[in-house]
Amino acid sequence: MKIINIGVLAHVDAGKTTLTESLLYNSGAITELGSVDKGTTRTDNTLLERQRGITIQTGITSFQWENTKVNIIDTPGHMDFLAEVYRSLSVLDGAILLISAKDFVQAQTRILFHALRKMGIPTIFFINKIDQNGIDLSTVYQDIKEKLSAEIVIKQKVELYPNMCVTNFTESEQWDTVIEGNDDLLEKYMSGKSLEALELEQEESIRFQNCSLFPLYHGSAKSNIGIDNLIEVITNKFYSSTHRGPSELCGNVFKIEYTKKRQRLAYIRLYSGVLHLRDSVRVSEKEKIKVTEMYTSINGELCKIDRAYSGEIVILQNEFLKLNSVLGDTKLLPQRKKIENPHPLLQTTVEPSKPEQREMLLDALLEISDSDPLLRYYVDSTTHEIILSFLGKVQMEVISALLQEKYHVEIELKEPTVIYMERPLKNAEYTIHIEVPPNPFWASIGLSVSPLPLGSGMQYESSVSLGYLNQSFQNAVMEGIRYGCEQGLYGWNVTDCKICFKYGLYYSPVSTPADFRMLTPIVLEQAFRKAGTELLEPYLSFKVYAPQEYLSRAYNDAPKYCANIVNTQLKNNEVIIIGEIPARCIQDYRNDLTFFTNGLSVCLAELKGYQVTTGEPVCQTRRLNSRIDKVRYMFNKIT
């Protein structure tokens, strides 16, 4: 049986969950349509998703049509959940990008389409909600051509009378775009030679698989218009990116989920081989796991199975598998272009409304961060506060609601702040000698620090030979440096810095690696104090798409938000403004753009890197370490 995995992607409220229900219903996988409004859909399966009417976590279901099994990945539609989208993209054989006939191309549609093209995933456009009043499809087509791609092939026409339906175009009506994109076919056509349908179909298929051509279909998921035709298209146009024939096992973990009973489930896409119940499987070329329970989606329901074949999505109950773990032969994993996950830029302090629920909160955050690596947390050793870092405010609102719904923990959040970093201002060295007060450790250490260009990251080298200071002591120094770089003079992580271990001395047999591990961060801090540090803040590169008449306002307002305009372009009826902006200002700039363009602007942004801050220095409370802080205090007093 052929197995294909497709993604359903769209902006918020474009109807992707409703479309999934219609595909299941029309294929016979379910006997009754679920409703987003009533909270009875198969993929939006949490109360939070049903209440908000949006998809938050990747949902998986399936149907079978003739000799093809289709696994449907119903992905989130809000930019704060892009990490969930990106993880699911890597397992897809193709995608359906929904566009609401009422709302046209939205900001999120552009982001998702950019990701699909970058990863090389064949994509079909599906214009949904064509049965709503006042729909002008020609305007929708033009919007798609201007904002997504002009290389679309409109495969159907919409019949309004006697009943609304969609019918396939004849061959002559749909081949213009295919011919225009191939010089040989165009020359043949212009010379009056006849073109065979087979060669046109082959050209369309090649360009579709190469993501340079996008077939376009219509329908209404809610009214069940065009769904049968879409099922035929899905099963015939998409190909499975799996290894055929006998081969070693290869699979990739793309989702971690916890059940209500706290069972930990790992979702795996198989790319080759066969996975059997009770198999012992090597994970990421390291340890082995034993398959004790295995599930897959069959006609919209999770069912236990005893074997799974290449192309399938399986679910294992396992405590050790992590996101992106590879089962079996890592060499068989398809090499797809990667998209950088959004980087957490905000952090806040969270505490339970009821102090007695603190342990419950920490246990819940451990599970949530295991499923979503973009949510990170730690407990401040000084204040004992729980610090969360995350992507956006909507993500934080959802996590707050999730904690209340699933874990029964209400929380209170402080106003979020941007996550900063630090860099040394100049070269500096510092040495602390053994048996010289106030050094209580049986170790001598000398370190130098040097600033590096922005974006260089951390570099480390040792000029102390292993013959003079053995590996265990040197490893302890590196561990101490990693710890010391977690807090610069302002309390933020240090980056763009070269650290050199220049001098070390030990006394045998009393010196231990722990002496070097404890002394290193103290030496490093003193070196930073001599060098001084500057505060770095995250900068975003952005693109603003807006109607041409708003160019002057958008351009002139940029300096108010510390934005630097790099370039402006005119395309069709839009102006494109390209620039850089501090992360702390992006939300205010977006809100301003939305206000004065009456919601007609789109602002796309991604992390560019860290630059020297233009705002006031922001300090973060240092985390305490009872074993070294007294010594730190003594050295700070004498320097």
Swiss-Prot record:
Q: Which PROSITE patterns match?
A: G_TR_1, G_TR_2
Is Transcription one of the keywords UniProt gives this record?
Answer: no
CDD domains (UniProt xref): Tet_C, Tet_II, Tet_III, Tet_like_IV, TetM_like
The answer to whether keyword Ligase applies is no
The GO terms describing molecular function are:
GTP binding; GTPase activity
Q: Which UniProt keywords apply?
A: Antibiotic resistance, GTP-binding, Nucleotide-binding, Protein biosynthesis
What does the entry list as the binding residues for GTP?
10-17, 74-78, 128-131
Q: Which Pfam families match?
A: EF-G_D2 (PF22042), EFG_C (PF00679), EFG_III (PF14492), EFG_IV (PF03764), GTP_EFTU (PF00009)
InterPro entries from the xrefs? EF-G-like_DII, EFG_II, EFG_III/V, EFG_V-like, G_TR_CS, P-loop_NTPase, Ribosomal_Su5_D2-typ_SF, Ribsml_uS5_D2-typ_fold_subgr
Q: Where does the chain cross the membrane?
A: none
Domain named tr-type G: residues: 1-242
What NCBIfam families is this protein classified in? small_GTP, tet_protect, tet_protect_M, tet_protect_M_W
Query: What does this gene product do?
Result: Abolishes the inhibitory effect of tetracyclin on protein synthesis by a non-covalent modification of the ribosomes.
Q: What protein family is recorded?
A: Belongs to the TRAFAC class translation factor GTPase superfamily. Classic translation factor GTPase family. TetM/TetO subfamily.
Query: What name appears for this protein in its UniProt entry?
Result: Tetracycline resistance protein TetM
Per the UniProt record, the source organism is Staphylococcus aureus
Gene symbol?
Answer: tetM
